[in-house]
Amino acid sequence: MVKLAEFSRTATFAWSHDKIPLLVSGTVSGTVDANFSTDSSLELWSLLAADSEKPIASLQVDSKFNDLDWSHNNKIIAGALDNGSLELYSTNEANNAINSMARFSNHSSSVKTVKFNAKQDNVLASGGNNGEIFIWDMNKCTESPSNYTPLTPGQSMSSVDEVISLAWNQSLAHVFASAGSSNFASIWDLKAKKEVIHLSYTSPNSGIKQQLSVVEWHPKNSTRVATATGSDNDPSILIWDLRNANTPLQTLNQGHQKGILSLDWCHQDEHLLLSSGRDNTVLLWNPESAEQLSQFPARGNWCFKTKFAPEAPDLFACASFDNKIEVQTLQNLTNTLDEQETETKQQESETDFWNNVSREESKEKPTVFHLQAPTWYGEPSPAAHWAFGGKLVQITPDGKGVSITNPKISGLESNTTLSEALKTKDFKPLINQRLVKVIDDVNEEDWNLLEKLSMDGTEEFLKEALAFDNDESDAQDDANNEKEDDGEEFFQQIETNFQPEGDFSLSGNIEQTISKNLVSGNIKSAVKNSLENDLLMEAMVIALDSNNERLKESVKNAYFAKYGSKSSLSRILYSISKREVDDLVENLDVSQWKFISKAIQNLYPNDIAQRNEMLIKLGDRLKENGHRQDSLTLYLAAGSLDKVASIWLSEFPDLEDKLKKDNKTIYEAHSECLTEFIERFTVFSNFINGSSTINNEQLIAKFLEFINLTTSTGNFELATEFLNSLPSDNEEVKTEKARVLIASGKSLPAQNPATATTSKAKYTNAKTNKNVPVLPTPGMPSTTSIPSMQAPFYGMTPGASANALPPKPYVPATTTSAPVHTEGKYAPPSQPSMASPFVNKTNSSTRLNSFAPPPNPYATATVPATNVSTTSIPQNTFAPIQPGMPIMGDYNAQSSSIPSQPPINAVSGQTPHLNRKANDGWNDLPLKVKEKPSRAKAVSVAPPNILSTPTPLNGIPANAASTMPPPPLSRAPSSVSMVSPPPLHKNSRVPSLVATSESPRASISNPYAPPQSSQQFPIGTISTANQTSNTAQVASSNPYAPPPQQRVATPLSGGVPPAPLPKASNPYAPTATTQPNGSSYPPTGPYTNNHTMTSPPPVFNKPPTGPPPISMKKRSNKLASIEQNPSQGATYPPTLSSSASPLQPSQPPTLASQVNTSAENVSHEIPADQQPIVDFLKEELARVTPLTPKEYSKQLKDCDKRLKILFYHLEKQDLLTQPTIDCLHDLVALMKEKKYKEAMVIHANIATNHAQEGGNWLTGVKRLIGIAEATLN
């Protein structure tokens, strides 16, 4: 007989109520094992264990067991001991242990049976000798075992000698049955406190009343019960209907040959009943029809207990006195494989038979009298049901109707937090919630990094993370600027310090030989003789005065040959001199990795590929040496999302195991860990810079698994967005996409053969290449302007250009005039904004290709590109710009007033995948301009308006409400309409323009949500030529990237020029030289692009209205004074951003610029009832500041900055609701009492239940609590 498991124990047992059940066994009373040992043990077994000979947990007990039962909630195991004790046990799955909870000795002698109530987990019944039956309350008896007294069921109708079987009614919690050594069974009612029914049976064969030793209740019918006789003369199973208790309803007496010892009625199918007895057999019955279904092979001794697994009824176990507990399945039936095996066995030789006969087990199958499928294998009617996407679909039993329901299942709730974060592009609530339920310390560090990124932006974060620990760059730069004259005087003093005087003469042949070479002008010989005589310093001075580069190189080589192996500084000098960092990356101590990263930044300012390669190589080395967080920072700087994913994927199993230890099931642990991974990856990819394709199969598999989990909650929109971010040529992605579309009630879009492409989905634009020159469609002239007043094709903004170069993919560009906005692949989506009333007059052959400087310190700035005619030969728009070549991006002066509709079915000039690597050097310009560097003050950036895109352009889905995109658009030309550019990431620290006093007031209810702009400019107030061509760019705030360039063209007369430009915010870029006409050349310097080409300065007409821009410092302190009622009918001049965007409406400054750097200036405006919160937090911060070690000064400074954000919100009354303010009052009160753990509970409550209000200040409160607790003593 094939067995699923076999445990070599002579023991009674009980099943757990799990889907994958465990089995607990206890040495049965009255037996001695093969070693004649009388030891007793309670053991826990797993059906999935690799070694079935060893239990997963064991506990020695001082007495043997008569019975065991496991509570329905799996918390308590009750044991009936032979010494008269009732003992309770608990299991601990974390460390696989069994522990004794309590022991009771209320029975006068041996306890024979125990049974937990089916309806109330805390109620237990026990029976023993002398007719003793006790009712136990687990809640009370475990609290005070020594003082607890169990209840009795009441008065019995007749005396009972021994109670050996108990069974609770499955429908009524107060009714149970008992049976024993007497010739009757009793039905008890605890409410009536007495025996209410007396069952007895007289055999028709012998005329003698039979002993009813076993009792079992019907699983669904409260009036039906089964009893079994223990007599060997007439073994029978009796089915009773208590409404007629005089005569059994059914009698099953054609199976067992001897007395019956055990019954079990299947709880999942009332048509199945198991029995076992002293004839060593187990029988399966249909008690409803009184049919014997199967007889299982006989065992070697009595089978005294058999039970179905409660939650896996296909399995059952049988305990016998043959020293075995066997676990079998109802499906153990004869099949064709058994017949083939029998034929093979008969063909083996006699030698093989006798060699193997002692090792082979019996594979006897059960005898089947009537084949009956359990109800859980199929429906009795032709109905069917299935589930997908959170919906359960059922065909009604009559087959004529359909029922669709949305069941609420624990663990399959919709991820509303992630969906909302993608919609609002505000990940702070998600981060705050994750920070209070981190899995381990490493996971907490990752979320702290994301929280820091969300507050500072990528550029500011990297600037701080890659700076030296003692590098106060801002203070040093200011001090250097103030003392610049003193520095020049210092070097002048050094230069003039030596004054030759007095007589001297040349001594020795060496000096004379070298001097002769010098005075003769033979510099090479002088250097040669100096080096041959080990006069290295003299050789260096001689070479410095020479213009011969080879000579200088030879002297440096001599220096490195002598000192390179002796001095660490020489190694640094060698790498800097050779402009190679391989030696530093491979050999410099990893603890000094910041020296290497600085060298990489400075030596490869323009070679992005080489710089990123070295940063990744350094990150790999840091990761190998245990510097995990530092390696993540370098991968972020290099834009290597794949490297970050590889680290997190390798840690996934460990995080899953840690969740399992928190008493979570395997599924719960896996789904929670998967959701956390996707959320962490999504948030991180929002800040990473670079363009990449998802090729990691393991990462794709995780996303598909999460998509499947998301669809299980019915959130098809979120699932569709993530599917759109995956490679479209992946077969599994295609299958899942089709499945989700059909389940959501949509169909796959028809692919137009004329416009189909083979491009892969990327973290940026995954569907179409917007940079390919477009050929006109035959039969449709490219210069024809077609009035378009209808809805745009495929959701595009009317009149938007389809040929804009994409900006850097992971960090949003400041502005762009292209209709498509690309960010990080998993960045939040772009939202549609209201179209501007301005209409651009432009020829259909023109293209707007304006680039905004990426706000990443390692990304190069971009240059606007010129137009290209669609009728010309297709050009590579990514090829390096040659001197004299026109710059793309200018507007044609001849244009129509109405934007043209894109031609239909135009043929692309080239396929996108052929153009993937054609952009090397497109940003390189030949002209070098060096000017005196100076430090510029940073200004604030407000997010511009948002564009609608037909497809998600980043790794993060484009819109939480989007569905499957239509087929790719044809590369047809279209006129450019003045639409708002895509938004900046609102946390990126990039410069913006200061709004004039006439800017309308923007009302923001949540400072952490993207501001909504509804500003409309009147038609005709601005010349479209000025809007498109006379745009200037603000220098990027990136300290390492070259600043953006300005495109210049002559404005049309009568046009309104843009507002004056603010100063460049690049601390390393030189100051732009002001020209007489008010324009300036772009700054250049050691950290800028050496190949930048500058244009003639623009000439603007004098603005008719509007004051000059206010400095950001004044704006921060006097923000209210520059706000204006938007209802006034004023005409607003256009506001320019750092990229050519003609109609960029003014936006409010970022939160960081609005928060006053002095908290004292805002305290007087805070409401009186909230002032104590501010006062205490200030005082507590002042208290801990001198007590905090110097190495934690950065954390203290960060805490101060975050608390000022909180004070700002309390002053403005714009973010925090009253419940959150009440929580802050409670938190402050607890901190005053030094109850920091309780204060952290309040913090967790805010992060969990008020995450939208937590923003960036909540981490500051948490940090202050931690510092205050650490400095308490």
UniProtKB/Swiss-Prot annotation:
Residue spans of biased composition, Low complexity class: 1130-1154
Entry membrane topology: Peripheral membrane protein
Biased composition (Pro residues): 1095-1110
Modified residues (Phosphothreonine): T1050
Cellular component aspect of the GO annotation: COPII vesicle coat; endoplasmic reticulum; endoplasmic reticulum exit site; endoplasmic reticulum membrane; mating projection tip
UniProt-annotated stretches for the region Disordered: 815-835, 933-1162
GO molecular function: structural molecule activity
Listed GO biological process terms: COPII-coated vesicle budding; COPII-coated vesicle cargo loading; endoplasmic reticulum organization; positive regulation of ER to Golgi vesicle-mediated transport; positive regulation of protein exit from endoplasmic reticulum; protein transport
UniProt xrefs under Pfam families: Sec31, SRA1, TPR_Sec16, WD40
Disulfide-bond pairs as recorded: none
Biased composition (Polar residues): 994-1039, 1071-1094, 1118-1129
Function description: Component of the coat protein complex II (COPII) which promotes the formation of transport vesicles from the endoplasmic reticulum (ER). The coat has two main functions, the physical deformation of the endoplasmic reticulum membrane into vesicles and the selection of cargo molecules.
Quaternary context: The COPII coat is composed of at least 5 proteins: the SEC23/24 complex, the SEC13/31 complex, and the protein SAR1. SEC13 and SEC31 make a 2:2 tetramer that forms the edge element of the COPII outer coat. The tetramer self-assembles in multiple copies to form the complete polyhedral cage. Interacts (via WD 8) with SEC13. Interacts with EMP24, ERV25, SEC16 and SHR3.
Family note: Belongs to the WD repeat SEC31 family.
Other notes: Present with 1840 molecules/cell in log phase SD medium.
Protein name as it appears in the record: Protein transport protein SEC31
Underlying gene: SEC31
